[in-house]
């Protein structure tokens, strides 16, 4: 029984790393001279996400909508607008960004991320 439970948990975990029935834009979003690259995906319910990679460095982003940034792999520090503290974010962690704001990141290790647009 325990073995079967482990298999089910592994399958659930693998499913969470895959998106099905989506449209992917062929043209990549390229920022900071190619050090941050993402692709936009649209789900059947019109939900939009970007999947991307950030190379080590420091970057500042502006937002038009509320965002959920999920770190798939890698490590970075984030400073949200109007905050003085930097927060360390690693694989499996996430953070929220307010609409019409900005945030800074210091990417410590090459980072794969998923950004969900929540508006």
List each model region and its residues.
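A short, N-terminal "cap"/entry segment at the start of jelly-roll beta-barrel domains
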Residues: 2-47
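Short loop/turn motifs at secondary-structure junctions and domain boundaries
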Residues: 32, 59-61, 79
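A generic structural motif
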Residues: 42-44, 79-81, 106, 118
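Conserved short histidine dyad/triad with adjacent acidic residue
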Residues: 43-63, 96
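Short, conserved beta-strand element in jelly-roll/cupin
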Residues: 64-77
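Short acidic-glycine-tyrosine-enriched beta hairpin
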Residues: 83-99
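Ligand-binding loop in jelly-roll beta-barrel domains
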Residues: 98-119
């Amino acid at each position: 029984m325990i073995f079967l439970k482990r298999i089910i948990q592994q399958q659930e975990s693998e499913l969470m790393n895959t998106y099905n029935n989506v449209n992917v834009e062929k043209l990549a979003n390229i920022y900071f001279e190619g050090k941050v690259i993402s692709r936009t995906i649209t789900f059947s319910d019109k939900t939009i996400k970007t999947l991307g990679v950030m190379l080590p460095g420091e970057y500042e982003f502006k937002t038009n909508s509320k965002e959920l940034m999920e770190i798939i792999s890698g490590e970075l520090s984030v400073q949200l607008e109007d905050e003085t503290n930097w927060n360390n974010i690693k694989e499996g962690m996430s953070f929220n960004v307010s609409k019409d704001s900005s945030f800074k990141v210091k990417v410590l290790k090459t980072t794969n991320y998923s950004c969900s647009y929540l508006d």
